[in-house]
């Protein structure tokens, strides 16, 4: 495996552009993913460069092949088991990892919160991980309010040990990695209809619009985070999530016009 295929993340430059996904893999002249070094391989959700966003859909899981075709007679197999008793009445919140909760780098960082060894093709690389400000209080409270699911387009060999260290409270009831994404038109998309939950009671928190292009009405967008230790985004979002935790249908809130939209 090329070491550039383990972590899915976006750069600061991509974060400033319109609808840029994590680790854009699409070339104007080729459908093949282009190599972008170690980070792209470990950390990778990509964005569409062509056309309008896909419409939201609901119902049975949409299993999309790489060529965009929907296979016929595909048996329904959901990504999540049935909710535990303590979560049966809670909304399910899908939470992204890279640039949402943490930022990771292969370059040494003096103030890294975690250093994760990742083996790629027989070589161990050190991944330096910074925690986003307020992530601890955020995860603790979210775990109390919701059925939380970590869903990342990065590979488990990197993301799983990060989650072990990050989630001190067991907020994440499940963890989903790149193999659970739908690879569609050059993008890793998180298809919420495959979770096995009522979409009226599903939220996704992600810094990449490409990740939730199938279900934009379920999204709570969050700004990409890299290293600004004065960032308050997660802290500022908690009151909104407190409100959402009490509704019967998330669309009753998320489909309303939002300030600045």
Curated annotation (Swiss-Prot):
The active site is at 96 (4-aspartylphosphate intermediate), 98 (proton donor). The record marks 152, 190 as: Transition state stabilizer. Its EC number is 3.1.3.16. Changing residue 96 to E: Leads to enhanced neuronal differentiation of stem cells. It comes from the Eukaryota. GO terms for cellular component: nucleoplasm. Its main location: nucleus. Monomer. Interacts with REST. This is Carboxy-terminal domain RNA polymerase II polypeptide A small phosphatase 1. The lineage of its organism: Eukaryota, Metazoa, Chordata, Craniata, Vertebrata. The gene is Ctdsp1.
């Amino acid at each position: 495996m090329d070491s550039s295929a383990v972590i899915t993340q976006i750069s600061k430059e991509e974060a400033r552009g319109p609808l840029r996904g994590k680790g854009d893999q699409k070339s104007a002249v080729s459908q093949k993913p282009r190599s972008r070094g170690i980070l792209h391989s470990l950390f990778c959700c990509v964005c569409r460069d062509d056309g309008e966003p896909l419409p939201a859909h609901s119902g049975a899981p949409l299993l999309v092949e790489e060529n965009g075709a929907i296979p016929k007679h595909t048996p329904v197999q959901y990504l999540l088991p049935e909710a535990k008793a303590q979560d049966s009445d809670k909304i399910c919140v899908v939470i992204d990892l890279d640039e949402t909760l943490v930022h990771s780098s292969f370059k040494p960082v003096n103030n890294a919160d975690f250093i994760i060894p990742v083996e790629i093709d027989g070589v161990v690389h050190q991944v330096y991980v910074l925690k986003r400000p307020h992530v601890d209080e955020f995860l603790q409270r979210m775990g109390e309010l919701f059925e939380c699911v970590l869903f990342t387009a990065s590979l488990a060999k990197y993301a799983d040990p990060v989650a072990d260290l990050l989630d001190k409270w067991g907020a994440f009831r499940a963890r989903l990695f790149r193999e659970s994404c739908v690879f569609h038109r050059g993008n890793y998309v998180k298809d919420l209809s495959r979770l096995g939950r009522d979409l009226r009671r599903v939220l996704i928190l992600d810094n990449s619009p490409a990740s939730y292009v199938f279900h934009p009405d379920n999204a709570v967008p969050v700004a990409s985070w890299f290293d600004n230790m004065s960032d308050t985004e997660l802290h500022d979002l908690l009151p909104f999530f407190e409100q959402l935790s009490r509704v019967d249908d998330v669309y009753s809130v998320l489909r309303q016009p939002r300030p600045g939209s």
